[in-house]
A protein has these predicted regions:
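Ligand-binding pockets and gating/stacking loops
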Residues: 1-182
């Protein structure tokens, strides 16, 4: 089944460029159409840097964040007026250490951050139970303390965008009936 879906997706894409910005604009356009898809995924690689994250030499983390910004802008262009109903959710597979290592980078860590954007987001804010950055407030005295289960954030986005009940999402999507609300 997966191979059939994959092949159909490839056939539907035609000859559009495969860079993240072009794919985001294409996906936004498809999602803006009546009966179009309700979600898409764009993967951005090269964030797992351990050196030169902010010193302007080599792999610069700022360039990668600009790419995220450009992909969100491409979604917005593609969505057109459907942008007003959109939610864009960024995810990462692992956190980073709080302190910089000896090569101007950070290493794999525990806690992380996410970014939610889109036209349906009406208020800028940070959603966190912020413990602080003092050593005794860090996980194992080196990482951000994870205080919110990111699945709860995903569930809230699904709830808002698809109008589904939180408890249904918790039990049927995340298989955790005790998943807290955010």
């Amino acid at each position: 089944v997966f191979q059939k879906v994959k092949q159909k997706s490839i056939e539907n894409l035609g000859n559009i460029p495969r860079d993240a910005e072009s794919l985001a604009e294409y996906a936004g356009n498809a999602m803006s159409k009546k009966g179009g898809p309700v979600a898409s995924v764009i993967r951005l690689d090269d964030f797992d840097t351990h050196a030169s994250q902010g010193d302007g030499e080599g792999k610069d983390h700022g360039d990668r964040l600009a790419k995220v910004d450009n992909v969100i802008a491409a979604y917005k262009r593609g969505l057109g007026t459907a942008w007003d109903r959109s939610i864009i959710l960024t995810l990462t597979e692992f956190g980073r250490t709080v302190a910089m290592n000896g090569t101007w980078g950070t290493d794999h860590g525990y806690g992380t951050v996410g970014l939610i954007a889109g036209g349906s987001i009406k208020k800028s804010r940070v959603i966190a139970n912020w413990p602080g950055l003092a050593k005794n407030e860090q996980y194992e005295q080196r990482d951000l303390m994870a205080t919110i289960d990111y699945r709860s954030v995903c569930a809230a986005c699904i709830e808002q965008s698809l109008g589904l009940d939180h408890d249904l999402i918790a039990s049927q999507v995340f298989f955790d009936s005790k998943l807290p609300r955010v």
